[in-house]
Amino acid sequence: MIAVALTARPSYTKLKPILDHLEDFVIVSCASANLVDYGEVALQAERDFPGKVRRVYSTLAGNTLQTTAKDAGVLLQSLADVFADIDPAIVVVMADRYETLTASIAARYQNIPVAHIQGGERSGNVDDVVRDANSALAAYHFPATHLASLRVHSLTGSQHIYNYGCPSIDLAKQALLDPPVTVQEIGGAGAPLDFNQRFAIVLHHPETEQPNEAFNQMRTVLDGVRQAGLPALIIWPGQDAGRDLTAKAVRVVTQKHPEWSTHTCRGVAPRRFLRLLSQASVLVGNSSAGIREASYLGVPVVNVGARQRGRERAGNICDVEYDDYLWMVMVDVSKLKFPSAALYGSGDAGIRIAAKLTELTRKGV
């Protein structure tokens, strides 16, 4: 059996194309993936894979640096028990959030091999340390780019590095075949936006190392979109220190400017989100979706701040700081069109990763 750690809303976009091609597996859903405030992506996983999801609850209230550290400790204890109970052949972890590191530790210290997806990347903050620690603990590696694979090899010396691309590109490719998304399909609250007209998607998280600045930073981003004259779909941020301040800024700005057409929601199902992203005039914020999926979809991105600073990027990205001139950048960038870029893959990563994981389990790793 393969155990797949699902730790947050964005991770499911990358994991589902792999899960679609696995047979003997269990999804261990934990942290914010289980919580309504963050979109409860575990519920989507339960719909997609009935009987395959095991929930683990550990998240503490507060969204501060201290509660983040304590969350990791609580989750480590829980995952150690879960892995001891199900005794998987491999534990799969994704990327760089702190919750993934607890899964790697809980598995590795019980002599369960770890397969790490999306190692070797750089974002310019503490996530780099977590990502590299996951790679160091892992036996098998599935980086998303050639440069990332070189970094993983330099770090680990492993002969088990498989550069198949990012699985979320598979989902983006599939989403383009779907009919356009309407505001009624995504739920949430606010103005009944017409997604056939120009609009922005705002997806912005607190800067990892500046949680106390989250309110002012989000307010600057929102004011920029508003001053650019773009209706906006605002998706609530994920579970990070400073998240409550980011959410407060959304409430303050939208209430202060009722004339601005906005719609807010906690989350959108992964494939539906990617179809919606393909319809947007621009993605604004600091989500890795702008770096990965938006590059494949050819969607312009105004990437704000330092959260994604070190990422490999295609030509659709315009990097800016938090300042009063954001609106001018958004006006210009939102009018641009870009070709599809295959930097993070061409849409076949999921089936290839699943095949390799299945092969490894059959060999007894």
Predicted regions and their residues:
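Donor nucleotide-activated moiety binding/catalytic core segment of transferases
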Residues: 75-79, 83, 168, 172, ...
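A conserved nucleotide-sugar
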Residues: 24, 222-237
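A donor-sugar binding/catalytic signature common to diverse glycosyltransferases
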Residues: 92-94, 101, 141, 269-313
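C-terminal amphipathic helix plus adjacent low-complexity
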Residues: 331-365
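Nucleotide-sugar donor-binding patch of glycosyltransferase catalytic domains
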Residues: 295-337
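Active-site and donor-binding regions of nucleotide-sugar-utilizing enzymes
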Residues: 5, 12-22, 59-160, 165
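Conserved nucleotide-sugar phosphate-binding/catalytic loop shared by glycosyltransferases and other
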Residues: 24-68, 78
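A nucleotide-sugar donor-handling region in carbohydrate enzymes
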Residues: 32-37, 137-216
